[in-house]
Design a protein with these regions (language model features):
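An alpha-beta-alpha
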Residues: 185-224, 333-348
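Extreme N-terminal segment that seeds HTH/winged-HTH DNA-binding domains in transcriptional regulators
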Residues: 1-37, 41-44, 68-69, 86, ...
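Flexible loop/hinge segments that line or gate small-molecule binding clefts
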Residues: 143-181, 266, 292-304
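Amphipathic helical "hinge" segments at domain boundaries
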Residues: 1-11, 15-17, 25, 49, ...
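Periplasmic-binding protein-like
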Residues: 78-79, 133-143, 198-201, 254-267, ...
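Short beta-strand elements in bilobed, periplasmic/extracellular small-molecule ligand-binding domains
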Residues: 103-117, 169, 198-199, 213, ...
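Flexible loop/turn connectors
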Residues: 247-374
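Hydrophobic alpha-helical segments within soluble ligand-binding/sensing domains
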Residues: 5, 172-199, 240-248, 268, ...
Length: 374
């Protein structure tokens, strides 16, 4: 265990995870999930190797030889995902295609790996063989569980999360800010008079779902006492049948929601079809908002209210960050991309409710999503 911990620390130093000085022992012990005695034994090995110097009253100062630019770097960028490429959304596939094209133009190749998201013994062995030394200049994690994100973080591998990073983990991320979009959507619906608002999320182990639900609940709590409401949050098992089952159960409630916020665009389309099939008028009987966009949504009628961004610009920004990371090894800063609100034709007022002004702190549909990101 001591030698394994020393190897993880060496990888972190080699990839530039720490600059100038090492974090304190408490932080490293929590980060690597090892005891203080194991950590100190591993640090003693690195000290003998000259990785850092110890000065009384100061943290361990890293030696100049640990400059990552002095190390040979791989020309591979590896994407690790819970899904095979063909099961990703159309917009995600376009993003990966553009990323591959731009990486190739910069002298890198893109490799795509789909892996189980449970970290069992067999999965650990597969991951260990995948990340052998110099196998990739950097790793991009897409739709990965907290176990997989923690595994990469603990080994100090040069890692960028495409999406949200799980709470308590210290990895840079590049994401569309779904939490800000959710807060904005709540404000828009609230302004239209909705007080029974439902949120449909996939029952998944991914950080984006957790952040989105938390943002909705926090925004509801931040409303004034007279305006406060309890959101109706439901998780579905995925697929058309799973989404329809949860939607039907919501509509059978004694006080069904007058508006639904749906996280994933394919699920929003399923909800829209289910509502129309069962003769719910959208938006007269119920309003509907999707927190993400996809190419097929251009063909939906009525036009779905949703949050979208220019996918070419998004892919270009992602590629620029990944290429710089792969070339330099320097840990990039996290980037949250704010989508634009497209009102579509699926938001209306509940029957018998007049248009109202938004409560204090609640963004209206005339405000940008940036107002909800603050």
């Amino acid at each position: 265990m001591v030698e394994q911990t020393a190897d993880i620390l060496r990888q972190g130093l080699a990839t530039g995870r720490w600059r100038g000085e090492l974090p304190g022992e408490h932080h490293l012990s929590e980060l690597l999930q090892v005891s203080r005695s194991t950590l100190r034994a591993a640090l003693a090995i690195l000290h003998r190797e000259g990785a850092f110097r110890v000065t009384r009253g100061r943290r361990r100062q890293l030696a100049p030889l640990n400059i990552p630019t002095a190390l040979p770097r791989s020309t591979t960028v590896a994407v690790v995902s819970s899904l095979p490429l063909h099961e990703h959304s159309a917009s995600s596939i376009l993003t990966f295609h553009e990323l591959r094209r731009r990486l190739q133009a910069s002298g890198f190749e893109l490799q795509f790996h789909s892996l189980p998201q449970t970290i069992k013994a067999a999965d650990r062995r597969r991951l260990e063989s995948l990340v052998e030394p110099d196998s990739a200049a950097c790793w991009v994690l897409s739709s990965c569980s907290i176990g997989v994100q923690r595994w990469f973080m603990q080994r100090g591998l040069p890692t960028l999360v495409l999406g949200s990073c799980h709470q308590g983990l210290d990895l840079p991320c590049f994401q569309l800010d779904a939490a800000a979009a959710c807060r904005h959507a709540l404000g828009v619906l609230h302004r239209h008079g909705h007080r029974h608002i439902g949120l449909l999320l996939p029952n998944s182990p991914f950080a984006g779902s957790v952040e989105t639900e938390a943002s909705l609940r926090q925004t509801c709590l931040a409303l004034s006492a007279s305006e406060r409401m309890e959101p109706i949050v439901r998780h579905h098992s995925g697929g058309v049948a799973g989404v329809e089952q949860v939607t039907a159960a919501l509509l059978r409630l004694p006080s069904p929601p007058t508006a639904l916020i749906v996280m994933m665009p394919r699920d929003a389309l399923t909800v829209l079809c289910h509502l129309l099939l069962h003769r719910w008028r959208v938006p007269d009987d119920i309003s509907l908002v999707s927190l993400f966009d996809d190419t097929f949504m251009e063909n939906a009628s009525p036009a779905l209210a949703r949050y979208r961004c220019d996918h070419s610009t998004y892919a270009r920004r992602l590629a620029r960050q990944v290429i710089e990371f792969a070339k330099s090894g320097a840990t990039p800063r996290s980037i949250s991309v704010l989508p634009d609100f497209f009102p579509g034709a699926t938001i209306g007022r509940p029957e018998g409710v007049a248009q109202v002004s938004p409560p204090n702190g609640s963004p209206s549909d005339r405000q940008t999503v940036a107002a909800a990101a603050v």
